[in-house]
Design a protein with these regions (language model features):
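HIT superfamily nucleotide-processing domains
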Residues: 1-333
Length: 333
């Protein structure tokens, strides 16, 4: 397994061990017992972390949220990076981490259907795992993401991947945020939040601590961003007081999408500060210019070759229409 850098765009590509993956996926599909349910701990790799009572043992029932290594990891925790070149091309070993967050011991498919207290525990697990992985100096970025719908295992789970390089999309956000800060000495995300709250027309949801918006330049139909109202560059700095508000925001937005779009497949991704290094010139203003957030993207339409080839997105909806529809969709829990 290797990481290869595109010398033109700077994008990194992971060459995974694809030969193993179809067999593993097929075995999971054909399994009579869900490996993520409570009581099936022996069917997964040994747990890395779990929220569980102090008197319970690892890899045993009784847990609330459980984290295990991926069955088919994109990156492997063992080894050194061994950065090297093949003439003009850069590559390194595919060293990183790839973890599965099993969000509940009960056989529930969608995060939106979990109780608020359980979603709060899931988010707490994200925070603890991100903070722990950032202690490893080999890793530059830690990404939390979820793909709902079409999963091999129909049991609510998400994933965490730690990479030894900063993903290209995140680097573009960091550079754009830094440029804006250089001009105005303000966080661009804080300015977006201020304007969206003033105009209201793209606001989907808000509470004391968090704001959900249909972004002005939405790439996908019903795309929603979830941001902390208070400036914060790193996700793992969330306080205990803010956790319940984030759980409510997550559940409300996901339930609205579930109801309006008839339980669509969706993805969400955490965008947060990379693992900072004490290095001259290395994003010295990031604590002031960047703002962590989640991007939630229902898969309402398929991307076309034009979009893949150009970076232009064809979106048949406007964020103003989307926000109006989602605001009007009443949910109770």
């Amino acid at each position: 397994m290797t990481l290869r850098r595109d010398p033109i765009t700077g994008r990194w590509i992971v060459n995974t061990e694809q030969a193993e993956q179809p067999e593993k996926a097929q075995a999971l599909k054909e399994a009579e017992t869900c490996p993520f349910c409570g009581g099936s701990e022996a069917l997964t790799p040994r747990e890395i972390f779990a929220l569980r009572p102090k008197d319970s043992k690892p890899d045993s029932p009784g847990w609330e949220v459980r984290v295990v290594p991926s069955f088919s990891p994109a990156l492997r925790i063992e080894g050194e990076l061994n950065r090297r070149a093949e003439l003009m091309y850069d590559l390194m070993n595919a060293v990183g981490a790839h973890e599965i967050v099993i969000e509940t011991p009960g056989h529930v498919a969608n995060l939106a259907d979990l109780e608020l207290t359980q979603i709060e525990k899931v988010v707490k697990t994200y925070i603890l795992r991100v903070a722990d992985l950032k202690k490893d100096e080999r890793f530059r970025s830690v990404v939390v993401f979820k793909n709902y719908g079409g999963d091999v295992v129909r049991h609510s789970h998400s994933q965490i991947i730690a990479t030894p390089v900063t993903p290209k999309n995140l680097k573009e956000e960091l550079n754009g945020s830094k440029d804006y800060y250089g001009y105005k000495e303000r966080c661009i995300y804080c300015d977006i939040i201020k304007q969206e709250m003033q105009q209201s027309k793209r606001v989907v949801f808000e509470n004391e601590s968090f704001l959900g918006i249909a972004p002005f330049a939405s790439r996908f139909p019903y795309e929603v961003w979830l941001l902390p109202k208070k400036h914060s560059f790193a996700f793992e700095t969330i306080t205990e007081k803010e956790l319940p508000f984030l759980a409510v925001a997550f559940k409300t937005i996901l339930k609205k999408l579930q109801k309006l779009l008839n339980d669509p497949p969706y993805s969400f991704v955490l965008h947060s500060s990379p693992n900072l290094r004490e290095k001259s010139g290395y994003w010295q203003t990031i604590k002031y210019d960047y703002h962590w957030h989640f991007e939630i993207m229902p898969q309402a339409i398929e991307s076309s070759g034009f979009e893949w080839g150009t970076g232009f997105y064809l979106n048949p909806t406007t964020p103003e229409e989307v926000a109006t529809q989602l605001r009007q969709e009443e949910v109770t829990f």
